[in-house]
Amino acid sequence: MSLKASILSVATAVVLAVTAPVAAHHAVSAEFDSTKPITLKGTIKRIEWTNPHIYTNVEVKEPDGTLVVYRVEGAAPNTLFRQGWRKEDLKIGELVTVNGIRAKAAGSMNVGQATITTADGRKIYGQGAGGGARGPAPQ
C-alpha cells in the first residue's frame, strides 16, 4: 500500500470513528418509540438549560390522583437561543401541554421529540419535533 493510500485509510477511519457516536446520539429511535405518542398537561417543576439538550420536568396529575414527574427532552440551548428563546421564557410553576413520544425503556418517564405549549399558546419545539427545533420565538 502506498503512503498516500495509507494516509487516506487512516483519515477515513478517524472520520468514521468520530461521526459514529454523533449519529448514534441523534438517533431518536434508539431511545424513544415513535409508535407511543403521549400528551401531558402539567406544571413545570424544573428546567435544565444545558447542553446537549434542555430538559423540562413536568409534574402531571394522573387519573388516579397521583403526581408523576415526566422528563421532557428539548432541543439544544444554542438552537433555541438563535430563535429568540431564553431560559427565562419558561417558568417554574407554569402550566404547559406537552406532545411527544414515550421512551422505549419500561418504566421510563422520559419524553422525546416533544412540543411544549404554554398557557398563552407559545410553542417550544424539541429535537425532531415540528420539523426540527424551529418555532416562533416568544412574543
Which residue ranges define each predicted feature?
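OB-fold/S1-family single-stranded nucleic acid-binding modules
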Residues: 103-128
